[in-house]
Amino acid sequence: MESRWGIVVIGLLCCVSWVEAITSSPKIQVYTRSPAENGKHNHLNCYVSSFHPPQITIRLLRNGEEMPNVERSDLSFSNDWTFHRLVHTGFVPNDKDVFECEVTHNSVTKSVKWDRDN
């Protein structure tokens, strides 16, 4: 009986090691809570999904500088064991500033600019 438990434990450890070995690059979406109007308060959102492993850095930037008062959702996972997180902050859109989301993951470092037309 003890040998069966040993085999089960070894099998579970192999499965955990296999899941840890999977790397999936994040998908990044940058958008506002409501349609953007210059001079009107809004929220800038960066939704990052489908990444593994869970270690990730997500920053919201205005003209290359980190934005203040950023809030982060809890790190959550999907049925396929990839992770997702929402990062957001209040802001006032205008035509002169560049807003972007910068993501650093072991699979990629990438910045996605907010496109007010999408």
Swiss-Prot record:
UniProt superkingdom: Eukaryota
tRNA processing recorded as keyword: no
SUPFAM superfamilies for the chain: Immunoglobulin
Disulfide bridges in this chain: C46-C101
A single GO BP: antigen processing and presentation of peptide antigen via MHC class I
InterPro entries, alphabetized: Ig-like_dom, Ig-like_dom_sf, Ig-like_fold, Ig/MHC_CS, Ig_C1-set, MHC/Immunoglobulin
Keywords from the UniProt entry: Disulfide bond, Immunity, Immunoglobulin domain, MHC I, Secreted, Signal
Annotated localization: Secreted
Signal peptide (UniProt feature, chain positions): 1-21
GO cellular component: extracellular region; MHC class I protein complex
Gene3D superfamilies named among the record's database cross-references: Immunoglobulins
Ig-like C1-type domain mapped to chain residues: 26-113
Role according to the record: Component of the class I major histocompatibility complex (MHC). Involved in the presentation of peptide antigens to the immune system.
UniProt family annotation: Belongs to the beta-2-microglobulin family.
Subunit structure: Heterodimer of an alpha chain and a beta chain. Beta-2-microglobulin is the beta-chain of major histocompatibility complex class I molecules.
Name of this chain's protein: Beta-2-microglobulin
Originating organism: Tachyglossus aculeatus aculeatus (Southeast Australian short-beaked echidna)
